[in-house]
């Protein structure tokens, strides 16, 4: 089987929430849990969920960047989604920059870089 990378629009099977992601797929998946797909892509089942619902799998990546999907998925576990993805990334990067500024000799690094 050949590896493929595809941008994808999918619908989460349990919540009906649509989301965007990308698919990295090679080979074939099989087994009884495939009867319970994680999502649907263009009408075809994608991924799987265990009978107890505690294990879910998907070839789709990047789905949790979608704020609406993440909120719906977490809501299925009774957990609220806090904040948007992009804002969270910015906050994390700002905190990392502050940490580096405190613990690194930034001026010295800039001198070395010139």
Task: Name each model-derived stretch.
Residues 46-114:
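Acyltransferase
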